[in-house]
């Protein structure tokens, strides 16, 4: 069963849901989607009954969590979501694995009164309940903290309009130590036995130590082969404390030598805004299908012939949210990339993006990813 919700869903996902007659909650967003692809729409009552028997549900957006909270409130899954969405509770639960990890939950009022000299900088400041990189700040110096507090105040009302409280809650924040190492994202699910099944692993590429953007992620044969077993052991160990089963998760971690430290576990979904589809363009894996049908990828077979290739998801975020998508020269992108597998134009006022591109890049041509990562994208905007 699937819950579709704003702000975006890919045609690739809709095509799968339509062709396989997957039960989809009948809400306003799903009705709009059904105009493009015939969908097996079911009522809230039917969805609840289905969940009681099948114990498996996938959401394409964190906006769908409101329905889960309202309709499955007595179910164990809501308790698990609350723990995973609340970053302070999450840190507390995993503290036996990371006894020396510094974190502190704090209100906005307390944030304005904090003694900077007492902070163990560098630290990360973010909403206790958050999504993507919205409201995430790296704090090195006092001026960074002051700028973050000002930005929080300036964006408070806008974030309330854009995201439900279940997605981003700006009433509480968490200060936590900066995690060293290379950042990776994992799309996986825990099966009915609590065993983790990894569907994709991609690294988060940054332009500088202070960069917190979501511009570039990529996956490759080397990444999968290097980290799949390690991350499976990590997910197995964390589940001794989390006790998850029959749930999809999008996990972000940092790896520093032998240390794997979680940034966050995002429940009920894979990579947001249908960016999980990078697994399909790289490896032919429809992640939603693998979760719903309890499938496990045979990476030994899948990765054959994928040597020396990088498969990227590139977010075309607006440098200025007032720029209309009509000014963006999408065709110009083809001059800068070796092989664009799919270009997704997104003209949605609630999203400050022009769209996404999925690319295949030869390892020796990684400079094209470095280029787009450092670009402010104004060069693609017509005057």
Which residues does each PLM region occupy?
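Conserved N-proximal alpha/beta basic substrate-recognition cap immediately N-terminal to
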Residues: 29-119, 131, 361-374
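Glycine-rich phosphate-binding loop of ATP-grasp-fold ATP-dependent ligases
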Residues: 123-153, 183-185, 207-223
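Peripheral (often C-terminal) accessory segments that flank ATP-dependent C-N-forming ligase machineries
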Residues: 292-383
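Short, charged N-terminal beta->alpha structural module
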Residues: 1-37
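Conserved ATP-binding module of the ATP-grasp superfamily
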Residues: 100, 142-180, 237, 241, ...
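ATP-grasp fold ATP-binding core
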Residues: 94, 119-139, 158-181, 186
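Conserved metal-phosphate-binding beta-hairpin within the catalytic cores
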Residues: 239-276, 303-322
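ATP-dependent carboxylate/phosphate-activation module, predominantly the ATP-grasp catalytic core
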Residues: 177-180, 187-243, 266-295
């Amino acid at each position: 069963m699937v819950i579709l919700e704003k702000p975006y869903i890919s045609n690739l996902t809709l095509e799968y849901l339509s062709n396989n007659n997957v039960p989809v909650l009948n809400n306003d967003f799903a009705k709009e989607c059904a105009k493009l692809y015939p969908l097996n729409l079911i009522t809230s009552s039917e969805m609840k009954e289905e969940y009681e028997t099948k114990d498996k549900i996938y959401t394409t957006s964190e906006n769908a969590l409101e329905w889960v909270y309202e309709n499955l409130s007595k179910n164990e899954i809501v308790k698990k979501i609350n723990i995973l969405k609340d970053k302070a509770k999450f840190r507390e639960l995993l503290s036996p694995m990371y006894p020396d990890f510094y974190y502190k939950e704090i209100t906005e009022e307390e944030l304005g009164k904090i003694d900077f000299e007492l902070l163990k900088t560098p630290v990360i400041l973010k909403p206790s309940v958050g999504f993507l990189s919205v409201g995430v700040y790296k704090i090195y110096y006092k001026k960074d903290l002051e700028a973050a507090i000002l930005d929080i105040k300036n964006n408070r009302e806008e974030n309330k309009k854009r995201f439900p409280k279940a997605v981003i809650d700006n009433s509480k924040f968490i200060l936590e130590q900066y995690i060293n190492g290379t950042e990776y994202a994992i799309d996986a699910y825990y099966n009915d036995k609590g065993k983790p099944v990894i569907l994709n692993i991609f690294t988060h590429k940054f332009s500088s130590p202070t960069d917190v953007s979501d511009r570039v992620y990529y996956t490759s044969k080397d990444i999968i082969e290097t980290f799949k077993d390690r991350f499976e052991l990590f997910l197995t160990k964390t589940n001794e404390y989390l006790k998850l089963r029959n749930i999809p998760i999008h996990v972000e971690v940092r790896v520093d030598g032998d240390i794997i430290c979680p940034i966050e576990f995002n429940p009920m979904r894979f990579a947001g805004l249908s960016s999980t589809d990078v697994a399909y363009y790289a490896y032919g894996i429809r992640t939603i299908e693998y979760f719903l049908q309890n499938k496990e990828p045979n990476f030994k077979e899948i990765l054959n012939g994928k040597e020396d290739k990088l498969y990227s998801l590139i977010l075309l975020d607006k440098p200025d949210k007032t720029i209309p998508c009509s000014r963006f020269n999408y065709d110009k992108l083809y001059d800068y990339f070796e092989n664009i597998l799919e270009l997704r134009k997104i003209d949605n006022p609630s999203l400050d993006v022009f769209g996404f591109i999925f690319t295949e890049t030869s390892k020796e041509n990684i400079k094209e990813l470095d280029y787009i990562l450092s670009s402010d994208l104004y060069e693609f905007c017509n005057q």
